[in-house]
Amino acid sequence: MQLVLSVSGIVLGVVLVGGLSTGYVAPASQPDPVAQTVVQQYVSEVADLGDDEGHHGVWLQSEDGVLAHHQGAVPLPAASLTKVATTLAALQAWGPTHEFVTLVDATGPIQDGVLRGDLVVQGGSDPFFVTEDALILRQSLHALGLKRVLGKLIISGNFFMNFTTDPALSGQLLKHVLSPPPRRAARQWHRTLAPEGQQLTIAGAVEVVSFCPPTRASLVRHRSLALFKLLKRMNVYSNNAMAEMFTAALGGPPQMVRLAALAAGVPTYELHLINGSGLGSENQLSARTICALFAAIHRLVMPARLTVADIFPVAGIDRGTIRHRHLPVYTVVKTGTLRHVATLAGVILTRTHGPVWFALLNQGGNLWGFRTQQDALLQSLVEHWGAADPPPASFIPTSPWADTTRNDILVRVKAGGG
């Protein structure tokens, strides 16, 4: 079986020199024969577990060129490997340290701990505003001395909480944390989460508005996690809601595809994507393109002193969707699963070839069998080439998972206020 891709008589490959460049040029003239044999055996085994060999894709590439390939240029259902494109588009649009800002304002004066007006929350498309953030927000409002809101809780802009994109429901979730309903169980829950004296009462209902009303004072600015940390959380747990929020903030799937293709140096027609999460077999990528997307991510984050391991789960360190996998240690990966699809892509760190980018796309019915074979293939390749020891620093996580306080207390009375 020919494992080096040829399209229209031209041999193609993804340039990953130093892991930095992308695009298509001639690969190494001598693909690794052992890798070719291992891939051939892998394809035969996964075909026995699912669909025939034409429904499986493999691409292995080092900085020197293509090492082995099967159906590498054929778009196949990518499942959550679609999130690799979403990740790249987000990094291209905003940069790895970008923060999404949620503002909390007041429409009236605050006197003796009482806001005589509405509390206004202006969402900024933060995809990871969760209950813990709401609790910290309540603490910040308490630090301002705010104890009671006589008006409503007004939701403006793109405010999401606990992964729901419904602004009304997000507002209700926020109010439930800031000002729990007067039920005994709720009061007990509230006292458990907040020290005595930090309770906040909001008298009015939640109201969602299209345009932010005039406000009198800016109270708190809540900053999201840095984008690279948001993407890490999305990819470790393959969070579909976060992926769709990112895609919406980018302007929708077509714009996401344009940004990802631009950053990776590949044509847009190689990204057959209808959403940002990968839900649906209509989302299709070739194994070759997925490797180009991964390499572009590595290139984009390096100027910020980050690595691709700060963006995706790392075997032996992270859990999430790889908690039951048997991958070579320090392998940086993204998993993908649909009802009849199991995919895996990322980079293994080898002694012989350095970083080797890979993408494996499998279709059929035996998902656990596919995963077992995927893990075994990577273990075989690392055994053949040797594991990088120590692993290169450019592929090791640099940033801790832990969070820091991200609320800025503003207390700024706007012009015309009192």
Language model segments and positions:
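Beta-lactamase-like hydrolase cores
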Residues: G18-P75, R138-A143
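Small-residue-rich helix-loop
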Residues: A35, H69, L250-G418
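Extracytoplasmic
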Residues: E53-H55, A73, A79-T82, T97-E99, ...
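Soluble periplasmic/extracytoplasmic beta-strand elements of cell-envelope proteins
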Residues: G57-Q61, A85, D118-Q122, K152-S156, ...
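Active-site SXXK
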Residues: A78-P96, L153, M234, F358
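Short, well-structured active-site flanking segments
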Residues: Q92-T107, A304-A309
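Active-site-adjacent, His/Asp/Glu-enriched structural segments that form or flank metal-binding
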Residues: L103-M161, P167-L169
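A small/polar active-site loop signature that marks catalytic segments
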Residues: V149, F159-I311
